[in-house]
């Protein structure tokens, strides 16, 4: 099997960085439903190292984190050659037009405000992962 075929047949890997257990549980449920593999972190201090080592297909990054904020983590990810091109979604309780602009200027590919609908999260993940999800796992979510 070629490397390209191996890549498309593997489940996408998502790195989730969230310090609230209930939010982690919700995100892991959504990712499991989509058929994704995932790594959950509640401490942002090692996010850059984990991203470099595992090369996830997508990162879901809370903004209001202890130790390093999501914006600080994002700056580190964008400076690192091994992680600069990994799509990152800001997952935040901060809502508003000015916040959206701030996140996009910081390099986030998108953002979702808490509380969010699982369907909205799943559509966003599907869009950002393009063809890395198996069609059967996202058929209902991504169908237009």
Predicted regions and their residues:
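Charged docking surfaces used in two-component/phosphorelay signaling
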Residues: 25-33
